[in-house]
Design a protein with these regions (language model features):
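Extended acidic/polar, glycine-enriched regions
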Residues: 2-56
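N-terminal beta-rich core of secreted/periplasmic extracellular enzymes
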Residues: 36-121, 139-141
Length: 195
């Protein structure tokens, strides 16, 4: 049951314990709540409806508003100290987890309000974009930050898309385990003195 229309919607759970449903959302706004029930109620509070943007990239997207150690973001302090968790701006950082097989579920992270602490650790590029967007549109904005420094673009694309580029060598099988190749050492011993 969604608080914006109080309509109950039902669905069935499949053999994997998964379910899916669609519900009509109102115009941008909130906060709202949604209650789920399997006989016992679970209510999610403080839900906003509005723009949601996926912000991805490499180190230019990964750098937080506070900057990296020894690499501060010039002029970021006023944005950090003036961050307001009551503002309709939400931040979600996907935790980095590598895999050699395509991932369909199980993303680790959580939505956070725009508090000074959370803004400081959030992607600077994503935050400054979302901050401007929220002020311009005057609607709630959600930012999903998913980046990894020095990652290849191929890692962000599915196999079907990549197969259209013959110059990219795709493995026939998915590597599930990693062995370690023994390294070699080269050392030239200094000549020993002769009598």
């Amino acid at each position: 049951t969604a608080s914006w229309n109080n309509k109950k919607i039902q669905t069935n759970v499949d053999a994997k314990g998964e379910w899916k449903l669609s519900l009509q959302t109102p115009v941008a706004g909130g906060p709202y709540s949604i209650t789920f029930s399997d006989g016992e109620d679970l209510t999610l509070q403080n839900i906003l409806i509005g723009e949601v943007w996926f912000c991805s990239g490499q180190s230019n997207m990964e750098m937080p508003v506070k900057g990296f150690r020894g690499q501060p973001v010039f002029g970021s302090q006023p944005y950090i100290v003036s961050a307001n968790p009551k503002r309709p701006l939400r931040l979600y950082t996907v935790k980095n987890a590598w895999s050699t097989i395509p991932q369909e579920a199980g993303v680790d992270g959580e939505w956070k309000e725009a508090s000074p602490e959370d803004v400081a650790d959030f992607s600077a590029t994503a935050y400054f974009f979302g901050n401007q967007l929220q002020q311009s549109l005057d609607v709630p904005v959600g930012l999903i930050h998913c980046s990894w420094s020095m990652s290849k673009i191929e890692a962000w694309m599915n196999k079907e898309t990549l197969s259209g580029f013959p110059e990219i060598a795709l493995p026939d099988v998915i590597q599930r385990e990693f062995g370690w190749t023994a390294g070699t050492v080269s050392y030239t011993h200094p000549p020993s003195p002769r009598d």
